[in-house]
Amino acid sequence: MDIEILRNYCLSFDDVTEEFPFGNDTLVFKVSGKIFLLAGLNNIPLQFNIKCNPEKAIELRESYDSILPGYHMNKKHWNTVIVEGTIPPHLIKEMIRDSYILVSASLPESRRKNK
C-alpha cells in the first residue's frame, strides 16, 4: 500500500474529509470532524496512526513487529502501522475500516451520516 492507495481507501468511506491541521507533512482523515487516521507523508516506509479497540491493539502489536503503540497518541487506543510488507494488505484495510467504524460510532447521533 502506498499513500495514494491509502488516501483513496480512506476517502471511500462516508462523510470523510482530508486535512493538514498539523502541517504539510501529516495527512489527517476525519469522519464528521473526528480523526480516524493520521499519515506521515515524509515517512519511508509509509506509516500511519489508527484508532483501535484496546484489546485488539495489544493483540496486533504482539502479532506484528510493524504495529506499535500510537506515536504521539493515546497508546491504549491508537496504533502506529508501518507498511513494510509484513502485514497482509487485507489486514491493513481491515484496521483502517475498524478505525473509521470506531470513531463513527463515538459520534453523537446528530453527527452520524446514517442515523
Which residues fall in each region the model found?
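Charge-dense, helix-prone N-terminal extensions
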Residues: 1-115
